């Protein structure tokens, strides 16, 4: 029986090692390809488009006994796509092409202050992600001109502490809930200007405010949440589109419909916040 258990453990470790090898090769290949891009290239879109077709899989950061950095380029959700592409962009801009450089960049984006110290140290609300990464100098939230940034979001987050049963780590470690609740209180009350849904269809206004490769954070009116979905801005002939890891399409796609039409199909979506990766 012990022998069988050891074999199973060995197989799992082997599969994990193979996955890590695939991920590291993917990252190094993409960073190598980025060296050939002209200085005028939109690096966030260059990298994001490389992931089109990758399967949408949620919760890929969960399930580890001890919190650690997870690199998974094979399966993405809306948040991990944004983090993966942003980390690649930062590396390419700084001419850092090693896998270790990428892991440092990803750690800095995903964990508060760039330090891994248990599950609560991971940034779980995108508003805090913006605040933390603005503080570290890697992104800037665009909140002007007005119009189109005519609306103000007053953040009120408590979804995780109010629904701990929805999160594996909180079910297994109820002591984390108090820490998460403290973070929620710190983030709540902050105000940010955003573009309301009704103005997202105004191409003339948006052209002056949103650029290719900007991170789009879709605001919502769902109780306890700040952001419903994430993706990257892509301008096409008919208007602004969203490149995202789509739960609906079950893969990474550049949405065929305009972002305005996309938002209209989701009554709880109220508008968009715009975050730009610093150069």
Question: Which stretches of residues belong to each language-model region?
Answer:
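Bacterial Sec-dependent N-terminal signal peptides
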Residues: 1-24
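Short N-terminal segments immediately surrounding and downstream of signal-peptide cleavage
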Residues: 20-36
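Short alpha-helix capping/helix-loop boundary micro-motifs
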Residues: 194-206, 220
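C-terminal soluble interaction/assembly domains
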Residues: 211-279
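Acidic/His-rich structured neighborhood in mature extracellular/periplasmic domains
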Residues: 56-193, 235, 239, 244-247
């Amino acid at each position: 029986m012990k022998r069988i258990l050891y074999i199973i453990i060995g197989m799992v470790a082997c599969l994990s090692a193979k996955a890590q090898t695939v991920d590291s090769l993917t990252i190094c290949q993409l960073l190598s390809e980025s060296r050939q891009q002209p200085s005028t290239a939109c690096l966030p879109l260059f990298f994001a488009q490389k992931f089109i077709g990758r399967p949408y899989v949620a919760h890929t950061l969960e399930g580890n006994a001890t919190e650690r950095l997870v690199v998974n380029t094979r399966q993405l959700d809306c948040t991990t796509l944004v983090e993966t592409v942003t980390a690649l962009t930062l590396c390419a801009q700084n001419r850092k092409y090693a896998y270790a450089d990428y892991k440092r960049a990803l750690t800095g984006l995903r964990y508060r202050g760039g330090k891994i110290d248990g599950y609560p140290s991971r940034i779980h609300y995108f508003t805090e992600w913006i605040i933390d990464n603005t503080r570290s100098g890697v992104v800037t939230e665009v909140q002007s001109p007005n119009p189109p940034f005519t609306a103000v979001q007053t953040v009120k987050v408590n979804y995780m502490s109010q629904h701990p049963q929805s999160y594996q780590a909180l079910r297994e470690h109820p002591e984390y809930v108090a820490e998460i609740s403290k973070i929620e209180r710190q983030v709540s009350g902050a105000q940010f200007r955003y573009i309301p849904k009704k103005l997202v269809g105004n191409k003339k206004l948006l052209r002056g405010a949103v650029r290719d490769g900007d991170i789009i954070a879709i605001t919502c009116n769902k109780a306890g949440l700040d952001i419903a979905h994430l993706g990257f801005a892509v301008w096409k002939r008919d208007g602004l589109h969203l490149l995202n890891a789509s739960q609906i399409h079950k893969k990474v796609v550049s949405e065929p419909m305009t972002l305005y039409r996309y938002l209209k199909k989701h009554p709880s979506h109220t508008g968009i916040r715009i975050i730009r990766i610093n150069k």
